[in-house]
UniProtKB/Swiss-Prot annotation:
Its cofactor is Cu(2+). It comes from the Eukaryota. It comes from Cucurbita pepo (Vegetable marrow). The gene is PETE. The keyword Flavoprotein does not apply. Participates in electron transfer between P700 and the cytochrome b6-f complex in photosystem I. This is Plastocyanin. InterPro entries: BlueCu_1, BlueCu_1_BS, Copper_blue_Plastocyanin, Cupredoxin, Plastocyanin.
Length: 99
């Protein structure tokens, strides 16, 4: 699945922001706008035993240009919340369910 970071209208959002994948399915987060974005998983809102640091971008790393991507495979079933650290306060958050 491809998830866009930033709407075509300039909105600070993940599109889609709530979706499901199969365990091990590749998720491609793609910068859709000229704003710097990243993808950080919330260590308190992922399945127990999953290391948020291994699935998240470093908070200092940013996808600066349109078309830049971050890819991740989630293998543990459950619910994962994530956010863009520069824009979390603006509501740029999302959730993926791994089945």
């Amino acid at each position: 699945i491809e998830v866009l970071l930033g709407g075509d209208d300039g909105s600070l959002a993940f599109i889609p922001n709530d979706f499901s994948v199969a365990a091990g399915e590749k998720i491609v987060f793609k910068n859709n706008a000229g704003f710097p974005h990243n993808v950080v998983f919330d260590e308190d809102e992922i399945p127990s035993g999953v290391d948020a640091g291994k699935i998240s971008m470093n908070e200092e790393d940013l996808l600066n240009a349109p078309g830049e991507v971050y890819k991740v495979n989630l293998t543990e079933k459950g619910s994962y919340s994530f956010y863009c650290s520069p824009h979390q306060g603006a509501g740029m958050v999302g959730k993926v369910t791994v089945n």
